[in-house]
Design a protein with these regions (language model features):
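Zn2+-dependent cytidine deaminase-like catalytic core
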Residues: 1-28, 113, 146-150
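Histidine/acidic-residue-rich, glycine-tolerant segments that coordinate divalent metal ions
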Residues: 3-9, 28-40, 67
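Hydrophobic, well-ordered secondary-structure segments
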Residues: 10, 26-33, 75-82
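Active-site ligand-binding patch in enzyme domains
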Residues: 38-42, 46-55, 59-187
Length: 187
């Protein structure tokens, strides 16, 4: 049950003389909003993972020439899923390899917040993600350098300048905890 209601709703209805049948078609009811019920019961985000690969287990040719591994129907389903989600997260490798937009291309589509895990702030300022950040909410999660890891003051100045430039483009640069030098997704 939702902690804001904490099971009191049924009691209120009964007190008002309304017949209440609980657990009637429970599985069917729960399937109407799996995202909400997942969050209420686990307090963790509902995650949908999109992954494409060829029959031989590859995601692209060796030259990187293959643009589409999935068909048109799969790409449309991705757009419908994106429309329903609050955020879409990719690693910096995807941004560097594909320069994606990560938006919804449906005529009446809400674009989710774009989240890029980029521990070392390698995202190019001229990437489609950065260039459209004022149009689509964008967060770049990065790991701030620890004092012991900074080789010289120029390195830290560069990072601070990069954060400023990202923010000028409309990107929210979010310093986060690290796990083995990578963005810690559990925090």
């Amino acid at each position: 049950p939702n902690p804001k209601v904490a099971g009191k709703g049924a009691g209120i209805l009964r007190a008002a003389g309304v017949q209440v049948d609980e657990d009637f078609m429970r599985k069917e009811c729960d399937s109407l909003n799996p995202i909400f019920f997942h969050y209420i019961t686990s307090r963790t985000p509902y995650v949908i993972m999109k992954y494409a690969m060829t029959a031989d287990g590859k995601i692209a040719t060796k030259t990187g020439a293959s643009k589409w591994v999935t068909g048109e129907a799969s790409r449309m389903e991705v757009q419908r899923l994106r429309h329903r989600c609050m955020g879409i997260m990719v690693g910096i490798g995807t941004v560097l390899a594909d320069d994606p937009m990560l938006n919804v291309r449906l005529s009446e589509g809400n674009s989710p917040v774009r989240i890029i895990c980029d521990s070392h702030l390698r995202i190019p300022l001229d990437s489609q993600i950065c260039q459209t950040a004022k149009q689509y909410p964008t967060v770049v999660a990065y790991v701030p350098e620890r004092e012991s890891c900074i080789k010289d003051s120029c390195q830290e100045v560069y990072r601070q300048e990069k954060v400023c430039k990202l923010e000028q483009l409309g990107v929210r640069a979010l310093p986060v905890s690290d796990r083995n030098g990578q963005v810690d997704l559990r925090k």
